[in-house]
Design a protein with these regions (language model features):
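Conserved small/polar residues in nucleotide/adenosyl-binding loops
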Residues: 1-5
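Electropositive, glycine- and tryptophan-enriched low-complexity nucleic-acid-binding patches
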Residues: 9-13
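Short histidine-centered catalytic/ligand-binding loop motif
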Residues: 20-29
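Short, well-ordered amphipathic alpha-helical segments that serve as non-catalytic structural scaffolds
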Residues: 30-46
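Short glycine-rich phosphate-binding loop at a beta-alpha junction
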Residues: 51-59
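Phosphate/ribose-phosphate-bearing ligand recognition and processing surfaces
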Residues: 62-76
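Divalent-metal-activated hydrolytic enzyme cores
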Residues: 75-120
């Protein structure tokens, strides 16, 4: 996920592995329910304005050869968490490249807000 305030030019990105930490879980950026609010808080602390924040979401691909019982994949759960967390934080989504069966490599230019994606 890339988030940037185009007015101030302040931006950053995160990558989380799991959607949520569960009851009593450690507060770590590897979880989406922690990583997204942490990134937004850091951008605001650096001078970004919440109303100006724009997000781009990438990933959520199902890169394993098996589908879990019930058909829900970790990638789909991560995408759902990302979208939900952005709504909760009041951050507008401007683009997404999610799902599929391949991983992604991402480069984010915080100066102009461009994001380059390579499918692996």
């Amino acid at each position: 996920m890339c988030i940037r305030d185009p007015i101030s030019g302040i931006g950053g990105m995160n990558h989380f592995l799991l959607p949520g930490r569960g009851p009593g879980g450690e507060r770590s950026g590897r979880y989406g329910d922690v990583a997204v609010p942490l990134l937004v808080a850091r951008l605001l602390a650096l001078g970004a304005a919440r109303n100006d924040l724009r997000a781009k979401v990438f990933g959520g691909g199902h890169v394993l050869s098996t589908v879990p019982a019930g058909g829900r994949t970790l990638g789909a759960d991560n995408v759902q968490m990302a979208m939900s967390a952005l709504r909760d934080e009041g951050v507008r989504l401007v683009s997404e490249d999610v799902g599929g069966t391949r991983g992604r490599k991402l480069a984010f230019n915080t100066v102009d807000g461009t994001a380059l994606v390579w499918r692996l």
